[in-house]
């Protein structure tokens, strides 16, 4: 395994320094908005943000508690300095998975198993009902939508589930005939609402393959799907990685699969064993041609329910060579600082054109960008937790091309060891 210290930091001192600038979110007081920005070293873009809650990072526990279960109904496009460039008002929902189209339309996974498409001005121009697709949704090159459903598996398959006494972290239970297993179903839907392709995990995976640490009945919990891009493996003759085949992440069994789109067979599977192995990961993608690491698979390894509890509570970004399954690169915080990068659920990442990696630590609402050596060159702390925010190029839509290019203003954070909040009597109102 070639982790090389650059995965955490080429120089241990560099990452230790970078780790000092990270909000730990155990404190009551911390800034929000853009907290770090080095324009000369960051890859600058817009960021598309949707929230779980508008007050998740409010200092008052009472305010946070009163907002529990209330989801804001806006999705925002911000620049690197945190300025809001555009807003869509949408049907409020806790997860709000969304994708921006090159036309400027926004496709959004909303409540009541409804997928919405809004135009730039916020008008609903398309809906699809009946497939929830809460965890992920992809726009395919033909403009069809690839959706995920988690419905009970058919009864004839349910009977194949063996009774097993298991003792997950929250107490013993019987897995098998006593609980209904939710499956994983993929549907490709066209703009007329027709299902033109479908795939069902219970036809292809062993129903008795499970993790004892997962919730009752939640067999796979597929949380991300991604069509394979053009890639060097297929160019060299490896049919498993045909562009358009589907990369699927089965969170609860800690495995990533490739599904042959034509035959529907599983043609590849992978995981990793670094520090106890993959643990409830999200957002597995193959890095696109033209980007550093092209052809490798990159994922957000949350660090929840790890084997032997080896990195429980410590999140990694892991880049894998899909041929050898060797780890090519890892981002993590080290030592006692490791608690400072952790998202129990959700999360995303993206390899950027300059070799940096964009990361969204969704549970805390912290979005940041790291160089290959681990140095943080941009960081933004949202008003609350986020739902896998995405990188949007400056020229991605006609509407964005018509806007002036945003200012890219350096933000240098204070030294945490020297920064002090003065007593109220010694400062003007609003000053710190």
Q: Where are the regions a protein language model picked out?
A:
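Bacterial N-terminal signal peptides that target proteins for export
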Residues: 2-12
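Glycine-centered signal
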Residues: 1-2, 18, 315
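Bacterial N-terminal signal peptides
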Residues: 11-22
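Histidine-/acidic-rich catalytic cores in large beta-rich domains
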Residues: 26-432
């Amino acid at each position: 395994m070639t982790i090389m210290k650059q995965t955490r930091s080429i120089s241990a001192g560099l990452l230790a320094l970078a780790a000092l600038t990270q909000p730990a979110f155990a404190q009551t007081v911390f800034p929000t908005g853009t907290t770090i920005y080095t324009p000369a070293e960051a890859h600058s873009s817009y960021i598309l943000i949707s929230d779980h809650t508008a007050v998740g990072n409010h200092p008052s526990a009472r305010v946070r508690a009163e907002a529990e279960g209330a989801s804001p109904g806006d999705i925002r496009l911000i620049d690197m300095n945190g300025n809001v460039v555009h807003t869509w008002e949408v049907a409020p929902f806790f997860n709000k998975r969304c994708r921006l189209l090159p036309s400027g339309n926004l496709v959004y996974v909303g409540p009541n198993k409804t997928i919405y498409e809004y135009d730039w001005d916020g008008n609903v121009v398309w809906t699809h009902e009946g497939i929830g697709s809460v965890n992920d949704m992809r726009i395919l090159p033909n403009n069809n939508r690839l959706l995920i459903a988690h419905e009970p598996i058919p009864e004839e398959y349910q009977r194949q589930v063996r009774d097993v006494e298991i003792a997950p972290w929250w107490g013993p239970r019987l897995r098998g005939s006593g609980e209904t297993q939710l499956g994983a179903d993929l549907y490709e839907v066209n703009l007329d609402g027709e299902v033109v392709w479908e795939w069902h995990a219970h036809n292809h995976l062993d129903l008795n393959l499970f993790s004892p640490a997962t919730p009752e009945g939640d067999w796979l919990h597929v949380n991300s799907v991604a069509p394979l891009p053009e890639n060097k493996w297929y160019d060299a003759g490896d049919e498993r990685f045909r562009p358009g085949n589907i990369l699927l992440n089965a969170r609860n069994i800690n495995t990533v699969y490739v599904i042959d789109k034509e035959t529907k067979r599983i043609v590849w599977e992978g995981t990793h064993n670094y520090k106890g192995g993959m643990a409830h990961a999200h957002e597995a993608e193959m890095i696109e041609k033209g980007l550093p690491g092209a052809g490798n698979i990159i994922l957000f390894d949350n660090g929840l329910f790890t084997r032997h509890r080896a990195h429980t509570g410590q999140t990694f970004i892991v880049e894998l060579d899909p041929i050898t399954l060797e780890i090519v690169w890892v981002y993590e915080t080290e030592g006692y600082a490791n608690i400072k990068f952790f998202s129990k659920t959700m999360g995303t990442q993206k390899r950027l054109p300059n070799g940096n990696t964009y990361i969204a630590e969704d549970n805390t609402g912290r979005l940041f960008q790291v160089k290959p050596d681990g140095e943080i060159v941009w960081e933004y702390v949202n008003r609350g937790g986020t739902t896998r925010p995405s990188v949007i190029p400056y020229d991605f839509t006609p509407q964005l091309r018509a806007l002036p290019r945003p200012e890219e203003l350096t933000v240098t954070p204070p030294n945490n060891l020297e920064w002090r909040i003065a007593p109220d009597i010694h400062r003007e109102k609003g000053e710190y």
